[in-house]
């Protein structure tokens, strides 16, 4: 990325990430669509309550794997094969123990979590069952992410995408057969998700064992090395904390939505699936910006940094125009995929109003993600954490004020408020950074 036009580099790097994001989002949306249409509004609401809690666990796992991936990439680049294998072994052993403990703790604390979130009595039982089963799937999620990080560290970003695609298709097929065809309930929805996660982890392990021997630890390398664990945790801690802030905020907002009733909960679950299709690809473009800036900074090509960042922002805004327009035009049709039968019209009306506002507001996270990508590429991880905490904290506070007064649209305005504050912090700091680095 240190030579040639920035647009080509950024676009080609972001496309596989975007495809992976869309597959993961489709994977999640299929669960919600099938639950809402074949089981009912209560099942859709139950998944909506459980989602933010599980996202907190998943993003913490992702942060740990990102930290390990950085170290594995360094070892691979330095041709230190033994260190590469030992880093992967340390990550897998420590992460497995951590995830098993988190799964057990999550299962034990599920009733307390649901009471803290003020989950309505009508869905308390099924939400608890769904959440406990998905907690048990956390170790499989970790294994897939850790193995995928290993494959990406040696330059293979396509194979993890294939396993993710297989997992998404398997989940959809199992849901359609067992829930849509045979009439099983919410328990089956949770189980099929865990089975699909386990399948992706197993495929990655088998592939690595047979096709990527340079990643496979030997018999004497299966141990936790403290000298490697420290850097893994340090690299991953800031990323994990930053990623965890958003789902914590979402859990707090979910508590405000829960007070609005089952219909609002179901609508919010549906619209957040649409939101994800806006936010997550914008984060992928930000990752491309990060890589571009980091490579050029490392190569001393500071003259390319600001130009590449401007191109990245244009890509972000271009994606917003596409996603915002589609959301505005198709929002009612999209929402009708999630619900059917009694109460569906109310859920669609609530969600449609929310998405009408958000289609415009999606421009704000396009900008904030671009700036976050810039700061990560410049090595300013603390700046990204401060910006995220400002945005999430004020968004949650605004939601607590607005949601009881104006309902679900209040959540949309709270999001916009948080993003505006984040930009008010990041934009001036960007110009200060450019002056300091003479960009």
Predicted regions mapped to residue ranges:
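Helix-terminus/linker motif at the lipid-water interface of multi-pass membrane proteins
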Residues: 26-45, 114-121, 177-184, 244-277, ...
């Amino acid at each position: 990325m240190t030579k040639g036009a920035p647009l080509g580099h950024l676009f080609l790097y972001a496309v596989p990430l975007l495809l992976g994001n869309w597959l993961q989002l489709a994977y999640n949306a299929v669960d919600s669509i099938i639950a809402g249409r074949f089981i009912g509004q209560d099942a859709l609401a139950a998944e909506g309550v459980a989602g933010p809690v599980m996202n907190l666990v998943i993003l913490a796992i992702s942060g740990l794997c990102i930290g390990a991936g950085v170290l594995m990439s360094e070892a691979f680049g330095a041709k230190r094969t033994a260190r590469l294998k030992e880093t992967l072994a340390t990550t897998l052993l420590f992460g497995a123990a951590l995830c098993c403990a988190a799964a057990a703790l999550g299962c034990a604390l599920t009733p307390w979590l649901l009471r803290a979130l003020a989950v309505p009595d009508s869905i308390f039982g099924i939400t608890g069952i769904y959440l406990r089963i998905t907690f048990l799937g956390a170790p499989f999620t970790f294994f897939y992410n850790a193995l995928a990080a290993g494959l990406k560290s040696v330059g293979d970003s396509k194979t993890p995408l294939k396993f993710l695609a297989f997992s998404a298709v398997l989940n959809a097929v199992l849901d359609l057969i067992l829930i849509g065809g045979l009439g099983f309930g919410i328990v089956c929805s949770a189980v099929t998700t865990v089975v699909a996660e386990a399948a992706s982890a197993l495929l990655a392990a088998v592939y690595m064992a047979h096709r990527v021997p340079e990643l496979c630890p030997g018999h004497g390398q299966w141990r936790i090395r403290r000298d490697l664990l420290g850097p893994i945790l340090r690299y991953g801690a800031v990323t994990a904390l930053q990623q965890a802030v958003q789902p914590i905020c979402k859990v707090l907002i979910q508590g405000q939505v829960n007070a609005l009733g089952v219909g609002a909960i179901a609508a919010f679950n549906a619209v957040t699936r649409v939101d994800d299709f806006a936010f997550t690809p914008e984060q992928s473009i930000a990752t491309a910006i990060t890589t571009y800036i980091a490579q050029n900074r490392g190569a001393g090509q500071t003259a390319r940094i600001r130009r590449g960042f401007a191109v990245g922002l244009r890509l972000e805004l271009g994606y917003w125009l596409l996603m915002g327009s589609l959301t505005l035009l198709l929002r009612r049709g999209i929402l009708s995929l999630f619900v059917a039968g009694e109460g569906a019209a109310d859920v669609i009306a609530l969600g449609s109003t929310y998405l009408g506002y958000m289609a415009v507001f999606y421009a704000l996270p396009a900008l904030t993600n671009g700036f976050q990508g810039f700061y990560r590429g410049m090595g300013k991880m603390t700046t990204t954490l401060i910006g995220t905490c400002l945005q999430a904290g004020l968004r949650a506070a605004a939601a607590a004020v607005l949601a009881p007064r104006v309902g679900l649209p209040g959540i949309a305005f709270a999001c916009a408020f948080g993003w505006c504050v984040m930009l008010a912090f990041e934009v001036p700091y960007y110009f200060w950074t450019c002056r300091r680095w003479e960009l």
